[in-house]
Amino acid sequence: MKKVIVGISGGVDSSVSAYLLKLRGYDVMGVFMQNWDPYINKESNNDAIKSKLDTCEAEYDYQIASKVCQRLGIKLERINFIKEYWDMVFEPFLDEYKKGLTPNPDILCNKYIKFGAFHKYCFENFDCDYIATGHYADVRFNQANNIYELLEAKDIEKDQTYFLCSLNQSQLSKSIFPLADLTKKEVREIANKIGLDNWDKKDSTGICFIGERNFKNFLHNYIDKKPGKIIDIDTSKEVGTHEGIHFYTIGQRKGLNLGGNSSRYFVCKKDISNNILYVTSNESKLKNLSSVVATCSYFNWIGYVPNNNKVEIRIRHSKNKINGHFKILKDNVVQFEFDSPEVISPGQYIVAYQKGVCLGGGPIKDNINE
C-alpha cells in the first residue's frame, strides 16, 4: 500500500483530499504546517488575532485539522517552518516591495515551503511515497516527452496552476492533487455528506500562511512609512500625500485617499528615487500605461520548451488568459508579446499555457509600451 502525506490546513479542500485518498486505498497521514507566528515575527497590528481573543490563527486552524483527522481516522503530525518561511518567502517579498515591485509570495511559498521544505521533511521523516495537497490542479506523466505535466483543474475559476508555476519535475513527480476533477461546490458537498464540520468554512484569502490582514497596516510592521507627495501629472499640482510609494501599483484607483477626487484618479507613474506618486484622471492615458511586450527573468519551464511559440498567458491569478507568443532571449530570460495591450507591473508573474498545460512562469523584469 502506497503511503501519502496530506498537507492538512484545516480548510475544506485539504480535508476532502485526505478523505478521497483513503477512499482510493492509500495509507494516508496528515501533516499540519505552521509557517507564521505573529508573536515571533513581531506583528503588532494583528486585528485577526484580536478577533479570535488572542488565539493564534495557527492554533485555531490546527484544532480544526485535528477534528478532521479524528473524523477520518488518520494520524496528524504538526511541523514548524516559521524560520524557513521568513528566510525564503517573507524577507524576499519585503525586499521586492521596498524596490517598488509587485511580488507574489504565494508562488514563492509553493516553491520553497509547500513543495520544498515540506516535501523534504516528509520524505526524510515519514517514509512516504507521495505528498498531496488541496490545490485545484492536476499532474500527469507525458510518456512521449518523458516528463510530468502540470494541468489546469476542472474548476477553472478555482484553478491554482498560476501559483504552482515554479514547480520542477522532481516536485511534480511526487505530488498528487485529489481535487483535479472536482468543483469547489462538489468538494463542499462531499465534506458535508461525510460530516466534516468545516464543510462551509470560508476560503482563505490574503498572503499565503499569514491570512487575512489589512494589507497596508500589516506591512507597516516591517516597512517604515515614508510619506511623499501625490502629484497630478497633467497639472503638476500636489493633490495629496501617500504613506509609502511601495504600497501602490500602476493603474491603481482604490486607496488613494484623495477626498472627493479619489474616484477619478489612478496611478500612472512612480518616481521611487524622489518618492513621488503621480496620478491622472485622463482615461486616455490608461492606454499608454498598457504594454504589448514584457520580459521575464528567471522563467521556470516546468517540463520542456514547446516548439510552437503561441501560448495563452495569465498575468494574474484572477484575470482571464490572453493570447500571445514568446521568444527566448537567453538562458531563462523569455520575452512575451501579447495580442492586446495589458497593464502590468515589474515583479508580477507571467504564466504560460498550451491546451490546458501550465508550461511555467516567471517574474516580469520590464515591459515595453505599445
Curated annotation (Swiss-Prot):
<feature type="disulfide bond" description="Alternate">
    <location>
        <begin position="109"/>
        <end position="208"/>
    </location>
</feature>
<dbReference type="Pfam" id="PF20259">
    <property type="entry name" value="tRNA_Me_trans_M"/>
</dbReference>
<dbReference type="InterPro" id="IPR046885">
    <property type="entry name" value="MnmA-like_C"/>
</dbReference>
<keyword id="KW-0067">ATP-binding</keyword>
<feature type="region of interest" description="Interaction with target base in tRNA">
    <location>
        <begin position="104"/>
        <end position="106"/>
    </location>
</feature>
<protein>
    <recommendedName>
        <fullName>tRNA-specific 2-thiouridylase MnmA</fullName>
        <ecNumber>2.8.1.13</ecNumber>
    </recommendedName>
</protein>
<feature type="site" description="Interaction with tRNA">
    <location>
        <position position="348"/>
    </location>
</feature>
<feature type="binding site">
    <location>
        <position position="33"/>
    </location>
    <ligand>
        <name>ATP</name>
    </ligand>
</feature>
<feature type="active site" description="Cysteine persulfide intermediate">
    <location>
        <position position="208"/>
    </location>
</feature>
<dbReference type="InterPro" id="IPR014729">
    <property type="entry name" value="Rossmann-like_a/b/a_fold"/>
</dbReference>
<comment type="similarity">
    <text>Belongs to the MnmA/TRMU family.</text>
</comment>
<feature type="binding site">
    <location>
        <begin position="7"/>
        <end position="14"/>
    </location>
    <ligand>
        <name>ATP</name>
    </ligand>
</feature>
<keyword id="KW-0694">RNA-binding</keyword>
<dbReference type="GO" id="GO:0005524">
    <property type="term" value="F:ATP binding"/>
</dbReference>
<keyword id="KW-1015">Disulfide bond</keyword>
<keyword id="KW-0547">Nucleotide-binding</keyword>
<dbReference type="InterPro" id="IPR046884">
    <property type="entry name" value="MnmA-like_central"/>
</dbReference>
<dbReference type="GO" id="GO:0005737">
    <property type="term" value="C:cytoplasm"/>
</dbReference>
<feature type="active site" description="Nucleophile">
    <location>
        <position position="109"/>
    </location>
</feature>
<dbReference type="Pfam" id="PF03054">
    <property type="entry name" value="tRNA_Me_trans"/>
</dbReference>
<keyword id="KW-0808">Transferase</keyword>
<comment type="function">
    <text>Catalyzes the 2-thiolation of uridine at the wobble position (U34) of tRNA, leading to the formation of s(2)U34.</text>
</comment>
<feature type="binding site">
    <location>
        <position position="134"/>
    </location>
    <ligand>
        <name>ATP</name>
    </ligand>
</feature>
<feature type="site" description="Interaction with tRNA">
    <location>
        <position position="135"/>
    </location>
</feature>
<keyword id="KW-0819">tRNA processing</keyword>
<keyword id="KW-0820">tRNA-binding</keyword>
<dbReference type="GO" id="GO:0103016">
    <property type="term" value="F:tRNA-uridine 2-sulfurtransferase activity"/>
</dbReference>
<dbReference type="InterPro" id="IPR004506">
    <property type="entry name" value="MnmA-like"/>
</dbReference>
<dbReference type="GO" id="GO:0000049">
    <property type="term" value="F:tRNA binding"/>
</dbReference>
<dbReference type="InterPro" id="IPR023382">
    <property type="entry name" value="MnmA-like_central_sf"/>
</dbReference>
<dbReference type="Pfam" id="PF20258">
    <property type="entry name" value="tRNA_Me_trans_C"/>
</dbReference>
<feature type="region of interest" description="Interaction with tRNA">
    <location>
        <begin position="158"/>
        <end position="160"/>
    </location>
</feature>
<keyword id="KW-0963">Cytoplasm</keyword>
<dbReference type="GO" id="GO:0002143">
    <property type="term" value="P:tRNA wobble position uridine thiolation"/>
</dbReference>
